[in-house]
């Protein structure tokens, strides 16, 4: 639909077509949601469900993008991106596709798995969880290494960070690694405290800033 903001408040939403708005779009669900088509808004896009989200296609917003669910799976070749991007899984977020945005915040209550073809990008990027796995994967004999990269500053708040086999944590600005994301001098989603365990095995942690 076009020409106005749209709100979909429903138990469930299914289909492999396009759900688009040339302004804002808000979708609230209580069951699992599988996005196999395109979910896009020229303005703000809010997608939340008390169930799980499985994205095998495209979720994008021209302005703010907010996605939240119990568990989120962003498959290889799938894309979640906004001008500012906020993604939260109450339990686990698994990414083999692309997550991108200007200022990007990716959080999960328990675990973030960025695997193989998985890329999590942002201008300023904050990643917060209990366990962060940034790991490689071999499919059909081809090994791919995962990447978490910020064009400006990178903040990672996690108790356990596993950066494995040629996978990369990269910041073109400053990099801060702590035990959680918090607020510093009025700025939110900054790494605070200390991570308990950092396993960096044959992998890269690199900052061109501080």
What is each stretch, according to the model?
Residues 9-10, 25, 51, 65, ...:
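GD-rich hexapeptide-repeat beta-solenoids
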Residues 2-6, 21-25, 40-45, 60-65, ...:
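Short "repeat-start/strand-capping" segments in structured domains, especially the N-termini
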Residues 1, 14-20, 33-40, 53-60, ...:
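Short, T/G/N/S-enriched strand-turn elements that build extracellular solenoid repeat scaffolds
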């Amino acid at each position: 639909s076009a020409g106005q903001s749209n709100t979909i408040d429903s138990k469930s939403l299914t289909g492999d077509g396009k759900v688009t708005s040339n302004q804002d779009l808000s979708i609230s669900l209580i069951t699992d949601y599988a996005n196999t088509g395109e979910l896009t808004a020229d303005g703000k896009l809010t997608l939340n469900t008390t169930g799980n989200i499985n994205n095998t296609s495209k979720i994008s917003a021209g302005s703010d993008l907010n996605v939240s669910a119990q568990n989120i799976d962003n498959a290889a070749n799938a894309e979640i991106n906004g001008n500012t991007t906020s993604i939260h899984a109450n339990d686990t977020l698994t990414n083999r596709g692309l997550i991108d945005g200007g200022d990007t915040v990716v959080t999960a209550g328990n675990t973030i798995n960025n695997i193989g073809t998985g890329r999590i990008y942002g201008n300023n990027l904050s990643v917060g969880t209990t366990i962060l796995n940034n790991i490689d994967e071999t499919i059909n004999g081809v090994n791919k290494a995962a990447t978490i990269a910020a064009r400006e500053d990178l903040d990672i708040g996690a108790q356990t960070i596993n950066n494995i086999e040629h996978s990369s944590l990269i910041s073109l600005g400053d990099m801060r690694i702590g035990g959680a994301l918090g607020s510093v001098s009025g700025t939110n989603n900054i790494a605070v405290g200390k991570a308990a365990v950092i396993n960096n095995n044959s992998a890269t942690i690199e900052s061109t800033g501080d």
